[in-house]
């Protein structure tokens, strides 16, 4: 009767071969923390990059961090000397307690997840939902999500464009929801909902607007090659959503999904090693 140690041997060999031959597969968990990005614009509250290359031209190429692609569209209007952007920006702004549109690049926690200096800001406007592309199939474990300072104070206090969540009585059943959709090619695999604010509780003391980094489990999305981020709110008007269409993101943890041929090769090698070892023992 083979011992437990004998049965574990092939698995050990598979992991060893994986580490040596295929370091980019599921052996490692890759993390995008935006620490490798270095092109910045200087804002009143700190450094950020929103697609502006500094040459008064439009740019829709997006940008990458740790090999992962982030959608971004920056438009510069030469006639009116005006610019606007949408998609993803990355930021080093540390101004989580300042409200208003001028502070659109700040995460409410003030720093990145775990106190890091860098994080990403998503703004869903002009060109639609923000998108992340991985270039190959991956399994995403989790993403850290929070509100931006701009959206947070808009919901908590209201402003000239948006209502105070809960209304004057505090009883309005408002919410601000982020839906994260996984795609494999053009096929949606699944979706995960995360509430950036939720005022639907019967007990108003349970109402909340997220102000800290929160880890969102995305394992249910399965094997994917892209993520789409959609925002919705109960505060809507003639021109769409009134709530500022922003959220902050950090620490994308994922692993590449091995190609079937690679898995078969590793399995055959492990089985061959184990059979040979058993034969020599006899």
Indicate where each model-derived feature is located.
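Bacterial N-terminal signal peptides that target proteins for export
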Residues: 2-15
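C-terminal membrane-anchoring or membrane-association module
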Residues: 273-282
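Short catalytic/ligand-binding loop motif for oxyanion handling, primarily in non-cytosolic enzymes
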Residues: 41-43, 148-153, 235-238
């Amino acid at each position: 009767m083979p011992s437990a140690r004998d049965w574990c041997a092939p698995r050990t060999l598979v992991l060893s071969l994986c580490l040596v031959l295929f370091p980019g597969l599921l052996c490692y968990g890759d993390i995008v923390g935006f620490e490798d990005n270095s092109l910045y614009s200087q804002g009143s509250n700190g450094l950020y990059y929103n697609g502006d290359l500094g040459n008064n031209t439009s740019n829709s190429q997006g940008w990458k961090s740790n090999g992962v692609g982030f959608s971004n569209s920056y438009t510069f209007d030469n006639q009116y000397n005006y610019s606007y952007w949408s998609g993803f920006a990355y930021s080093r702004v540390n101004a989580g307690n300042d409200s208003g549109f001028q502070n659109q690049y700040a995460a409410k926690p003030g720093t990145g997840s775990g106190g890091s200096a860098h994080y990403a800001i998503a703004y869903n406007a002009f060109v639609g939902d923000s998108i992340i592309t991985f270039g190959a199939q991956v399994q995403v474990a989790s993403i850290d999500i929070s509100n931006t300072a701009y959206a947070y104070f808009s919901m908590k206090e209201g402003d000239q464009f948006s209502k105070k969540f809960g209304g004057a009585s505090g009883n309005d059943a408002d919410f601000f929801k982020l839906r994260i959709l996984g795609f494999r090619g053009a096929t949606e695999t699944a979706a995960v909902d995360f509430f950036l604010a939720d005022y639907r509780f019967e007990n108003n003391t349970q109402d909340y607007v997220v102000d800290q980094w929160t880890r969102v489990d995305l394992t249910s999305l399965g094997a994917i090659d892209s993520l789409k981020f959609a925002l919705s709110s109960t505060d809507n008007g003639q021109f769409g959503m009134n709530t500022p269409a922003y959220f902050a993101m950090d620490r994308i943890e994922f692993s590449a999904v091995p190609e079937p041929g690679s898995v078969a090769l590793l399995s055959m090698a492990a089985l061959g090693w184990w059979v040979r070892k058993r034969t020599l023992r006899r």
